[in-house]
């Protein structure tokens, strides 16, 4: 079964709001049904075309390793689909975390866009999942996470694997918020050149170096047709590119999205902000993640281990970057914390 990409000919770019997925990291996966319903309704009124809803780590992510959801994600997907009048509901899945059965259940609950994420060198593990999603008639999007870690030409080769498997849009995903302007431009351009008309190209940014909006503009100018953001930067680390700022900038440079600037600003201020446990901050921890290239969802895990072992979170994050840890290796923060703790104790003993 084939499915067309949901893309209004009046748009230059399709925007996906990921507050209810990436924001789940910041909220420690504690969304309530009332919050999801209110946020979806507000985004829908503003004209946001795609709203992503799942556990922060995708389908099946509710676990001891990643953190348990307050409300089962499939219930939230169903509620979001019932609430949205115009917007499509997307869901994320990571092979090895989610399963084919999870994809089928998400579709049955009203999800219509399946976004499949792998580390940027492991696109081949997504092949069977893209095949299933296309058979089911789902629109497909591929995420090449931690895209800053390999050069553009290598990233393009991985994008080709996804496109050949049935992916209709491959994203350059700056999971660490580590890419700087031309780093985004070169990677997006490489994917556009490789994929041609076979698939669109997208960009997912984080604010860890304060460049989420600027990097998204670079991506669009390099040929990206899909862009991610989160209202109020509601996402992992310092958060994602704020949708309300993206729309303001896109309006000013003539990039059409179909989203009303004033309505999305209202949604961010009046509906999304009250659901946030705190603002997403560009603080020392977030900056270290962007500077050292650390997966943004490590932030809350690092803070937890910092409190548990009495070591600085920013040091944990810096060493995670030095070790080139990727998503799924959050448990190694415990080893790093113990290492720093031993160093502190030996240093204190030597000083006596």
Curated annotation (Swiss-Prot):
UniProt-annotated catalytic positions:
25
Domain Pyruvate carboxyltransferase, by residue range, is 13-265
Broad class of enzyme this protein falls into: lyase
Binding residues for substrate, per the UniProt record?
21-22, 175, 204, 295
Asked whether the UniProt record includes Lyase among its keywords, one would answer: yes
For this UniProt entry, the molecular function terms from Gene Ontology, in alphabetical order, are: 2-isopropylmalate synthase activity; 4-hydroxy-2-oxovalerate aldolase activity; manganese ion binding
PROSITE patterns according to UniProt = PYR_CT (PS50991)
Task: Provide the GO biological process annotations.
Answer: catabolic process; L-leucine biosynthetic process
Which keywords describe this protein according to UniProt? Aromatic hydrocarbons catabolism, Lyase, Manganese, Metal-binding
What does the record give as EC number?
A: 4.1.3.39
Q: Where does Mn(2+) bind?
A: 22, 204, 206
Q: Which family does it belong to?
A: Belongs to the 4-hydroxy-2-oxovalerate aldolase family.
Name-wise, this protein is 4-hydroxy-2-oxovalerate aldolase
Query: Which organism is this entry from?
Result: Mycobacterium avium (strain 104)
